[in-house]
Amino acid sequence: LVLTDCLGLDREYVTSMRGALPATRFAVEAYVRFVVEQPLVIAVASSLTELFAPSIHRERIAGMLANYDFVNDDVMAYFKRRLSQAPRDASFALEFIKTNARTREMQEACVDAVRFKCNVLWAQLDALYLAYVQGMVPPGAYKPE
């Protein structure tokens, strides 16, 4: 919310999710359903995308600070915290999986969970690109002025 506040978006509008891209809403709902319905070890495995978060966040923080004068360190605080939190989260998840995914079948299901999460993330990126780079914003989704 700090980032959307900085962007000048109305907080009630943001939290209502009225302007969310349909693909983003669908992807988030699919991911939540996935982690609720799967065995704990598989749900935890899906979080291993966090292994790559620090390098991605470092790049995004630098880009945002360099290219947008309205973005400052306070706005980037969440992402900066993730630089140290994400490796701890991923390390915990990896140890949990190594301890609890005892069969080949369970280990393969854990790998599939990471693939699923990557697909969820790609679906969101595709939707963002189509809407805000190609200009094909779906009806009802946020449309920058």
Predicted regions and their residues:
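Generic structural signal for well-ordered, non-transmembrane alpha-helical segments
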Residues: 1, 5, 22, 51-55, ...
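Active-site-proximal alpha-helical scaffolds that flank and shape metal-associated catalytic sites
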Residues: 1-78, 133, 141-144
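Residue-level detector of solvent-exposed, low-hydrophobicity positions
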Residues: 33, 59, 85-86, 103, ...
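General N-terminal targeting signals
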Residues: 48, 70, 95-96, 114, ...
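A short secondary-structure junction motif
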Residues: 60, 64, 93-96, 100, ...
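Long amphipathic all-alpha helical oligomerization modules
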Residues: 79, 83, 87-111
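Acidic, carboxylate-rich catalytic segments that either coordinate divalent cations
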Residues: 104-145
